[in-house]
Curated annotation (Swiss-Prot):
It holds the Pfam family Big_2. The keyword DNA-binding does not apply. Its main location: virion. Transmembrane segments: none annotated. It comes from Serratia phage KSP90 (Serratia marcescens bacteriophage KSP90). SMART domains: BID_2. InterPro entries: Big_2, Invasin/intimin_cell_adhesion. This is Ig-like virion protein. It is found in: Virion. One of its GO terms (cellular component) is virion component. Keywords: Virion. Residues 89-149, 176-253 form the BIG2 domain.
């Protein structure tokens, strides 16, 4: 059943007649002292200022009441469960998507489908099996904070605690390449001489730093596409280009073969 929250107040409210108890408002307040109206020290029948409005919103009337223990700190929050015998209960909760993958720093949104469609209380509470990696922000929104697999996202109905689940995988955030710089920028070599280009990809923490090399004139100088090793073949000048796999960023080294 749905739960509401009230603040503890020192008011004492008189009990209503037993004949009016068609609904029961119950709640757990561990550590509360037993009173004359409590069958169990951890169970309370309560009514307090502000509670009437909340019950009215649920189309219920407050019934049994008891003394709010004045020895407890004023402002202490107590969760109250409302029992409605006429409610149409939730039978299933289905979370969509049932599997999802996201990256660190992203926010993903899930939805919960409640059956039957005319269930009285359709609200759900969202949670994850690892809040340090996937933190629930409410309303099915999760903040992805760290890499993880097999994380269970749950939607629990406030009526009956029916649970729907989805599985979430979180991968490292992709850091895009913004540029590449070849070194040296110019080079003079003899025929048959070799040297290897160095490529610096920016930013330093880019996810994919792969660079491919090409020669504008292989007859003058060749280059190994993977390693960047250049070899002079004939006299002349040739441009050797390095291009990143991510973003197609380029830089050029001008090679003179003498």
């Amino acid at each position: 059943m749905p739960k509401i929250k009230i603040l503890v107040t020192p008011y004492v409210v008189k009990n209503k007649p037993e004949t009016e108890r068609n609904h029961v408002v119950t709640g757990v307040a561990d550590g509360w002292e037993k009173t004359s109206l409590n069958a169990d020290p951890n169970e309370i029948l309560t009514e307090s200022k502000g509670l009437d409005t909340l019950l009215t919103d649920c189309n219920l009337k407050p019934d049994g009441v008891t003394k709010i223990d004045p020895s407890k700190p004023i402002g202490k929050e107590v969760e109250i469960e409302i029992y409605d015998p006429d409610a149409i209960p939730v039978q299933t909760v289905t979370v969509s998507p049932d599997t999802a993958t996201g990256t660190v720093g992203q926010q993903l949104t899930f939805t919960a489908d409640i059956l039957p469609a005319d269930a009285t209380y359709k609200d759900v509470e969202w949670s994850s099996s690892d809040e340090a990696k996937a933190k629930s922000l409410g309303n099915g929104v999760f903040d992805l904070k760290a890499v993880g697999t097999g994380i269970i996202v749950s939607a629990t109905s406030i009526d009956g605690g029916v649970i729907g689940e989805a599985e979430l995988t979180i991968t490292a955030a992709v850091v895009a390449v913004t540029g590449v710089t070849l070194s040296p920028k110019t080079k003079t070599i003899a025929v048959g001489e070799k040297f290897t280009l160095a490529a610096t990809v920016a930013p330093a923490n880019a996810t994919n730093k792969t660079v491919t090399y090409t020669s504008a004139d292989p007859a003058t100088a060749t280059v190994n596409a993977t390693t960047g090793e250049v070899e002079g073949k004939a006299s002349g000048t040739v441009a050797i280009t390095g291009k990143t796999a991510d973003g197609n960023k380029t830089d050029v080294c001008n090679v003179t073969v003498s």
